[in-house]
From Swiss-Prot:
This is Beta-galactosidase. GO terms for biological process: lactose catabolic process. It comes from Clostridium acetobutylicum. SMART domains: Bgal_small_N. Belongs to the glycosyl hydrolase 2 family.
């Protein structure tokens, strides 16, 4: 569509989403000189326009500077803003977080495709540039890698084009608009358009130019697009590679290609063929190493465009990963091996920069994923920056690449399904926009081996438009599967070959798997990790070994979405929805991550790392069983360490290198010896990297297994050298032993004094408690209402009975408490004291039918205020709980207040 007259009407017309924008293409690097290949994305034919731009903010279009784009308009008086970046994080507009409902709820009464006339923030951007020498006299384009939500572009006062779709590149041919010397680029960005109705993701509602902006020029003959297709044969040892090219430029040229391995050896060379607008180059590669998340083997494809005399016009490079992903016998397979997605959903997010994240952020993220045994990411819920896909190719991460599509608020209101005005649904006026978003993602990302599955988007219900998108994916790229969870609610428009659900209970998944399923199952979202959470995850990972058709899931989600905010006293804090007086909002529902927004690792990650281990270690009294559940990697990449501890103190350790083939198991005897100590003996086995990798240093632990191989001897079974003195009073019973004294009260219902080395430790009698601070997920399921009588039980429990038993080497005291629950119940507390001052405490609650679930069962010990640190022998090092302790290790740990 060639149009030179912009119109604000486009903002409310879903059928106009691109004006003068060029077609999407592969994210390929290209150069005029072979020696420039090493520059990678800093290629000389590219000119970065990031930096400080002139900027003017308006709350709506009627207040904007209407003629700011004109060549003669003086912008020297307006403010500056940093590009890339969100305007809301640079002093303009307001930060707003919201989940499903649309952000204008309660402010404007709207229905698709309309937007507010009074509040639709406008950012008017201007920058000046001179075209660098390498780009002069060439066809030149401008690329906007990400602009939210809709924008108009002018160069030197001339209208260039218009585009929507926040998360894929928008590019325009500006060759005819450029001039010698200084050029003026003007961009007018609108926070809302008709596209806002289908960009209702669970995130902060930002706007502005938040990804890179750059110019690029192409040689006289240029490889405009590449689509790599591979066909593996001879038991996956060899491959035929077809490079389908779209060319622009001079027909008096030839094109050829060759493939290099990581050592720089040419392993396949094509014939030279003459120029054509569309052509295919053929290679046959022998003895290849396949790509997987475990072994991300990459090759480099070089495409050479030469003049007839042999002089180079252009060299194009493309990283290649050979892999074979398919549905085989109702199982998703990589190289015919069942794949399990140990995944997370990941928003692009930074506490300082929002979704305008940096390369450093991405490197931190991908190293964290690899270090925590996470092998897959769903790009929730939009295509990520192109660099992320290159990193996933290089480091080894499987991707579900998700289209920028979510219309949650149009069909689900207050948790109820009500799709009467759902978009895009089956509305023909939205279909082209939906398909354009799919095409923009596929065309850019189609050559990345990390992408295994195309996703039609998220939580947009169902209909003909999304169904047509799924048909497009399958026709365009049969080598990948198609995902869309939303059809679970409307199976008439089934789009996928696997079952995908959100937040199903493990028992519900098991019911599906036991009912002769026709499709394999994945959880595209599970383990809602909001706040203190991620308990019970083992109930899901246990299904991996039990059912072949259970193929894993994607935790919701990777990182908290919180923003730094400065308080009146100057202190910075991480702020959530509502903290910016944003209304409507969903408050702290943006905090669902395994990491905090500042990239501090949360205790939840400890559990995930363990349950996502690809190698299981099961130690016993003599050695360890190693179950290698990798698909392709032998355990000889790791060293096996063993550590024997006596009540947490090291008595023996060592290591060896062992070889266990993929998908096999082996028992390894360890030289750990026999130990006749009264203390508890624990064997910990650990697999650690034998060599450094891109993502961790040598010696980094990737898996562990632990077992108590000898229980602590009971105090009844060995003689105590310390004799106790029992003092019976009318109210108290005193127990005196070696360097300790304890007083148990018949009146108070427990210990009233506990002294070691004549030092008092406690302030009040310890009491049982049955209530804890509610977590975010508790509040989400109304736990505080359902279980509130346990709070009353904690506060109102009544001491009702006491008894005591004396033995030669110990004394046992029994206290019974009655709880004010309905029905009523009793709890018995037992103290067993030895002469050494060891006190074993047992709390016994048998359970009563008719009561709600017990939030917690514990004892509250109030210590003197002077104590500010403690050590313990128990599970650690991170916080753990009865349903989140698989990844914790038994040992001695220290902490402070």
């Amino acid at each position: 569509m060639i149009n030179n007259k912009p119109s604000l009407d486009w903002l409310e017309n879903p059928e106009i989403f691109r004006v003068n924008r060029i077609d999407a293409h592969s994210d390929t690097w290209f150069y005029e000189k072979f020696e420039d290949v090493k520059l990678e994305d800093t290629m000389p034919l590219k000119q970065n326009l990031n930096g400080k731009w002139r900027f003017s903010y308006s709350e709506n279009s009627s207040l904007r500077i209407k003629e700011f784009y004109k060549d003669e308009f003086d912008v020297s008086w307006i403010d500056y803003i940093e590009v890339p970046g969100h305007i809301q994080l640079q002093g303009y507009d307001k930060c707003q977080y919201i989940n499903t409902m649309y952000p204008w709820e309660g402010h404007d009464e709207l229905r698709p495709p309309h937007i507010s006339k009074t509040y639709n923030p406008v950012g008017s951007y201007v920058t000046f540039f001179e075209v660098k020498d390498e780009l002069k006299n060439k066809q030149t384009f401008i690329s906007f890698q990400g602009v939210e939500t809709a924008f108009y572009v002018w160069v030197n006062g001339e209208f260039v084009g218009y585009s929507e779709d926040t998360f894929t590149p928008s590019e325009f041919d500006i060759t005819d608009y450029l001039r010698e010397g200084e050029n003026k680029l003007a961009v007018e960005v609108y926070k809302r358009s008709s596209a806002s109705w289908i960009e209702d993701q669970d995130f902060w509602r930002f706007s502005g130019i938040f990804r890179d902006v750059y110019l690029y020029a192409v040689p006289e003959t240029h490889v405009n697009d590449i689509f790599i297709k591979t066909d593996l044969y001879d038991d996956f040892k060899n491959a035929k590679l077809n490079a389908e090219l779209k060319m622009i430029g001079n027909s008096e040229t030839t094109v050829e290609t060759y493939l290099e391995d990581k050592e720089g050896n040419k392993i396949a060379i094509s014939e030279k063929i003459p120029f054509s607008d569309e052509l295919t180059l053929y290679l046959d590669a022998q003895n290849i190493n396949l790509w997987s998340a475990e072994e991300p083997n990459l090759y480099t494809l070089y495409i050479l465009v030469n003049k007839k005399d042999g002089n180079l016009i252009e060299v194009v490079t493309q990283k290649i990963g050979f892999r074979h992903f398919e549905m085989k016998d109702k199982i998703m397979c990589l190289k015919w091996k069942r794949i399990i997605f140990k995944g997370v959903n990941r928003h692009e997010f930074s506490a300082r920069r929002g979704r305008s994240i940096t390369k450093e952020d991405m490197l931190w993220d991908i190293k964290f994923l690899k270090q925590h045994n996470i092998n897959a990411v769903r790009t929730s819920h939009y295509p990520n920056q192109s660099l992320w896909y290159r990193l996933c190719d290089e480091y080894g991460i499987y991707l579900i690449d998700e289209t920028n599509l979510e219309s949650h608020g149009s069909w689900q209101k207050m948790g109820q399904i009500e799709p009467s005005w759902n978009v895009p649904g089956s509305l023909p006026q939205w279909q082209a926009a939906v398909l354009d978003r799919a095409s923009s993602m596929v065309e850019r990302d189609k050559n990345h081996p990390s992408v295994l599955i195309w996703s039609c988007g998220n939580e947009s219900y169902a209909g003909e438009d999304i169904y047509q998108m799924s048909k497009y994916f399958r026709k365009k790229d049969p080598s990948r599967l198609v995902h869309y969870e939303g059809v679970t609610r409307c199976r008439e428009f089934m789009t996928r070959r696997h079952e995908s659900r959100m937040y199903a209970k493990a028992a519900e998944i098991e019911e599906y798997l036991n009912d002769n399923p026709k499709k394999p199952y994945i959880s595209c979202e599970y383990m809602h990790s909001m706040g203190n959470s991620t308990g019970g995850m083992m109930k899901y990972t246990e299904l991996e070994d039990k059912y072949l058709m259970y193929q894993g899931g994607f935790i919701w989600d990777y990182g908290d979405q919180a923003l730094y905010r400065k308080l009146p006293d100057g202190k910075e804090v991480l702020a959530y929805g509502g903290d910016f007086t944003d209304r409507p909002t969903d408050y702290n529902f943006s905090g669902n991550g395994l990491i905090y927004a500042d990239r501090t690792i949360s205790p939840k990650a400890q559990e995930v790392k363990y349950l996502y281990q690809n190698v299981k270690l099961e130690p016993d009294e003599k050695g360890v069983t190693i179950k290698n559940q990798n698909l392709f990697v032998n355990t000889d990449k790791y060293d096996l360490y063993y550590i024997v501890e006596r009540d947490g103190k090291l008595i023996k350790d060592g290591y060896l290198n062992v070889s266990v083939a993929p998908d096999e198991e082996k028992y390894i005897e360890l030289p750990i010896g026999n130990y006749n100590f009264p203390e508890e003996i624990v064997l910990t086995t650990s697999l650690r990297l034998a060599q450094a990798t891109l993502w961790a240093e040598k010696g980094y632990e990737i898996a562990f297994g632990q077992k108590v191989i000898k229980e602590k001897s009971d105090m009844n079974n060995h003689n105590s050298e310390s004799k106790m003195k029992i003092i019976h009073g009318d109210v108290n019973i005193g127990v005196h032993g070696k360097d300790f004294k304890a007083i148990f009260s018949k009146q108070e219902g427990g210990i009233v004094s506990l002294r070691y080395n004549n030092k008092e430790f406690i302030t009040r009698t310890p009491k049982t408690f049955y209530w804890r601070a509610t977590t975010d997920n508790d509040r989400g399921n109304r736990h505080e209402f359902r279980c509130s009588q346990w709070l009353a039980a904690t506060m109102g429990q009544k001491y009702v009975d006491f008894s005591v038993e004396e033995f030669d080497e110990k004394i046992t005291l029994y206290y019974t408490y009655q709880l004010p629950t309905v029905p009523s119940t009793n709890v018995k507390i037992t103290y067993e004291v030895s002469g050494e001052g060891i006190i074993k405490v047992n709390v016994k609650y048998k359970g009563v039918s008719g009561l709600p679930e017990l939030p917690v069962l514990g004892m509250d010990f109030k210590l003197l205020a002077e104590f500010n640190s403690f050590s313990w022998y128990g599970m650690g090092p991170e916080e753990n709980y009865i349903d989140r302790c698989e990844g914790a290790k038994l040992g001695i740990y220290e902490s402070t207040q």
